[in-house]
Amino acid sequence: MKPNLKEIARQGVRIVSNAGGVNPQACANALRAVIAELGLNLKVACVLGDDMISQRDQIAGHGYKEMFSGEDFPAVDKVASINAYLGAFPVARALQKGADIVVTGRCVDSAVTLGACINAFGWGRDDLDQLAMGSLAGHILECGPQATGGNFTDWELSNNLENIGYPIAAIKPDGSFVCSKPEGTGGLVSVGTIAEQMVYEIGDPQAYILPDVVCDFSKVTLTEIGENLVEVKGATGLAAPDSYKVCSTYADQFRGGTTMSFYGFDADKKAKKLAAAIFTASRRTLKMVGLPDYTETSVELIGAESQYGVNAAVANCRELSMKIAVKHSDPAGIGILLKECVGLGLATPPGLSGFAGARPKPSPVVRLFSFALPKGSLKIQIEMDGTYIDCPDTLGAALKRELIERPQALSAPLDSNMVHVPLIKLALARSGDKGNKANVGIIARQPEFLPYIYAALNEQAVAERFAHFLPEGATQQSLSYVERYLMPGTHAINFLIHDVLGGGGMASIRNDAQGKGFGQLMLDASIPVSAAIAAEVNA
């Protein structure tokens, strides 16, 4: 901020950021010190109340269950953080009180944008459609250049990445907005880039739950109105929920691993042989020193298409990177494996190589425990110039999913002569994580392609495609592991896949612990379409 503060003051730009992390007060105070050093007159406000770590004993005693798995609250001495996801109204209140810069701790990412909208347009808590649109604008903006050509299926169209432009949303009082990027910057803004970001990291698109509103994105429309200009309309809102999502992190075991490369004939077979030897030697040492076996092991051969499972198409692999990793209750168990990885370095099949510095070290497995906290339980405040302003919240209402009117399922096409084409010719895709779940959003390139995609990609087909990442037996219970949602406004389907990330995030020892590449795996699917469509997309 320091290099930009003078220009911020000169132009009267107001800044809202959730950069406060676990200590927003310290961040705000540091900003004030820099502002004073520069002799500027800027007011900094700080949103407080998300941090609940001081209440961990009471929370543990309350008996909260993990909101997805039903697990009990972790041991108190293992808990590192407890933070509630706050909403946008405290941000708006700070702006209304004259703050030039608003710093928050944990809040939903879209709240920084929605808070600015509430302040600018005077939206109230009952303006649900506007709140949903403002939240969608925030959702589009929150991952920066992922809305302007980053992580984009048609990546060849996104150029000058070293100077990629960050997204801009010009929002109107009714909530509709136009996405763009600064002139002269790289990347692009198109219906495709905005659609992909809209489906990123969402679950049920008709019940995208935020503290201030439950959003329905299923009828959103995207219209290209000029070069790098996309108009967004159509999100609607339901009443705010009656609880906050609270995330606690806690230490649970240890993890560690390393990567090494093989090249030459049968590189995949050589890597598998070495991995087996490392595990055998490590387990022998574990037994000698009286330690239990590893609680989880992972070997991934990046280059031999291990991420594709039964759909792998590489034969006679000649070059790959092997990632080997484990979990153990004792860091010494991790150290044993890391030592064996080095010790067996001269005993391997030929072609081993690698680029690395110091030997990796064991690190804690940090797991996430999420639970629903009834509204009214938090003391939310704004601190500005040493004054504390209370921001009481309304209690909200319980979401009744069974009352949501769902789009009509698409009828399967009846073409007699079907031709198989890869999904990537018919659709765009974007995937991401939701804890130990992953979502994969599929956006048809043309509306007429969607019925064919919908017919081919049912819950069973998706479970089978990701079977190597799912718990054993999941393909026999596909409806328990895969949810499928239609989004007619953008001719899209969103899939939510449960228990597919090996714990997700820091709890996982997968190479892709956040499902970032799952969309690419889906785009490889073969979809039967009419001969006319096949001719069109293959032209």
Predicted features and spans:
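A conserved active-site cap/scaffold subdomain adjacent to cofactor or substrate pockets
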Residues: L131-L238, R255
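An acidic, phosphate/nucleotide-engaging active-site surface
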Residues: I53-T104
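Catalytic or ion-translocation cores adjacent to nucleophile or general acid/base/metal-coordination motifs
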Residues: A36-S54, L114-N159, A455, E464
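Conserved phosphate/anionic-ligand binding catalytic regions in large, soluble enzymes, centered on
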Residues: N18-N23, A99-A116, L428-E448
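C-terminal non-catalytic interaction/assembly regions of soluble proteins
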Residues: K233-H420, K434, I443-L450, A455, ...
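Hydrophobic or amphipathic alpha-helical targeting/insertion segments
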Residues: V13-V16, G21-V44
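Helix-rich interaction surfaces within compact, conserved domain-sized segments
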Residues: Q476-A539
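Short, Gly/Pro- and small/polar-rich lid/capping loops
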Residues: E201, P205-N228, A397-A427
